[in-house]
């Protein structure tokens, strides 16, 4: 966290091999470990929550049903009736990102959503799916979208490359949005936590001054809980929007 008077706020994002020599040879770091943990937690939540409904649902089952209905309604309302076919994908995507965001807030954990390689891979998955669905639903008419309707044909050499570039930038913007928000939040938490420890090492006067950063860190933690859920929602709703455009004829 801090060495002497230096605060290393970016050290938390460094990848280190786990499982000793085996992990080093396989390039198996804490990032895939936390992805596996996130996947297991989501599956466990669904398994426990989606068991045959009791007469009086427990809290976990009630929470699972609320989450199910929320994502289902979002998919159908945004995409249309075709959204039911994409519901499992959107549901999995939302909770995988949400679990990754929240796991990163635990002590000695790792936020895999704070790595651009992970968020870009998720964004490319969404992008490729949207392109495949577009080609299947629209056929050759899909390429007509790169020429704005009503625009003069003479402007095609200028407008078509711009539209293609805008379309290809979707996975980049989608991945950077999640990555940047997670990095910014964790850097702020690390800085104020390190600042608190540095002040606490100054004796009684430092302990009094450290109250301020502690309060700020608690507020930041609450904010990160909100941001973690919000970013998972934004990623999911943008996925729905891209798929809505893909299925539109």
Swiss-Prot record:
What is any Pfam family matched here?
ATP-synt_A
Cite the entry's keywords alphabetically: ATP synthesis, Cell inner membrane, Cell membrane, CF(0), Hydrogen ion transport, Ion transport, Membrane, Transmembrane, Transmembrane helix, Transport
Q: Tell me where it mainly resides.
A: membrane
Gene name in the database record = atpB
Q: Which GO terms describe its molecular function?
A: proton-transporting ATP synthase activity, rotational mechanism
One GO cellular-component annotation of the UniProt record comes to: plasma membrane
Task: Identify the domain of life.
Answer: Bacteria
Classification lineage: Bacteria, Pseudomonadati, Pseudomonadota, Alphaproteobacteria, Acetobacterales
The membrane topology noted for this protein in its Swiss-Prot or TrEMBL record is: Multi-pass membrane protein
Q: How does it assemble?
A: F-type ATPases have 2 components, CF(1) - the catalytic core - and CF(0) - the membrane proton channel. CF(1) has five subunits: alpha(3), beta(3), gamma(1), delta(1), epsilon(1). CF(0) has three main subunits: a(1), b(2) and c(9-12). The alpha and beta chains form an alternating ring which encloses part of the gamma chain. CF(1) is attached to CF(0) by a central stalk formed by the gamma and epsilon chains, while a peripheral stalk is formed by the delta and b chains.
Regarding protein family, the annotation reads:
Belongs to the ATPase A chain family.
Enumerate the subcellular locations listed in this protein's record, separating them with semicolons: Cell inner membrane
Q: Which residues form a coiled coil?
A: none
Q: Which residues cross the membrane?
A: 30-50, 86-106, 115-135, 142-162, 191-211, 218-238
PROSITE patterns membership = ATPASE_A
Instruction: Enumerate the SUPFAM superfamilies for this protein.
Output: F1F0 ATP synthase subunit A
The name of this protein is ATP synthase subunit a
Show the InterPro entries listed in the entry.
Answer: ATP_synth_F0_asu (IPR000568), ATP_synth_F0_asu_AS (IPR023011), ATP_synth_F0_asu_bact/mt (IPR045083), F0_ATP_A_sf (IPR035908)
Q: Which organism is it from?
A: Gluconacetobacter diazotrophicus (strain ATCC 49037 / DSM 5601 / CCUG 37298 / CIP 103539 / LMG 7603 / PAl5)
Q: What does this protein do?
A: Key component of the proton channel; it plays a direct role in the translocation of protons across the membrane.
């Amino acid at each position: 966290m801090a060495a002497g008077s230096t605060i290393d706020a970016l050290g938390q994002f460094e990848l280190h091999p786990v499982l000793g020599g085996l992990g080093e040879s396989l390039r198996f770091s804490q990032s895939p470990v936390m992805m596996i943990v996130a996947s297991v937690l989501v599956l466990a939540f669904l398994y426990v929550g989606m068991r045959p409904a009791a007469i009086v649902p427990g809290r976990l089952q009630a929470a699972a049903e609320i989450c199910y209905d929320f994502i289902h309604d979002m998919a159908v309302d945004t995409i249309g009736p075709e959204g039911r076919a994409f519901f499992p994908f959107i549901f999995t995507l939302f909770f995988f990102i949400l679990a990754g965001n929240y796991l990163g807030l635990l002590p000695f954990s790792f936020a895999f959503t704070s790595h651009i390689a992970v968020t870009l891979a998720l964004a490319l998955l969404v992008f490729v799916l949207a392109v495949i669905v577009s080609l299947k639903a629209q056929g050759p008419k899909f390429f007509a979208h790169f020429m704005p309707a009503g625009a003069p044909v003479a402007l095609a050499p200028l407008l078509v490359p711009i539209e293609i570039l805008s379309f290809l930038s979707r996975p980049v913007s989608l991945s950077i949005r999640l990555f940047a928000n997670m990095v910014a939040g964790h850097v702020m938490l690390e800085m104020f936590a390190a600042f608190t420890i540095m002040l606490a090492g100054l004796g009684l006067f430092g302990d009094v001054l450290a109250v301020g950063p502690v309060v700020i860190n608690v507020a930041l933690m609450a904010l990160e809980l909100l941001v973690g859920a919000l970013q998972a929602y934004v990623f999911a709703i943008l996925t729905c929007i891209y798929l809505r455009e893909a299925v539109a004829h």
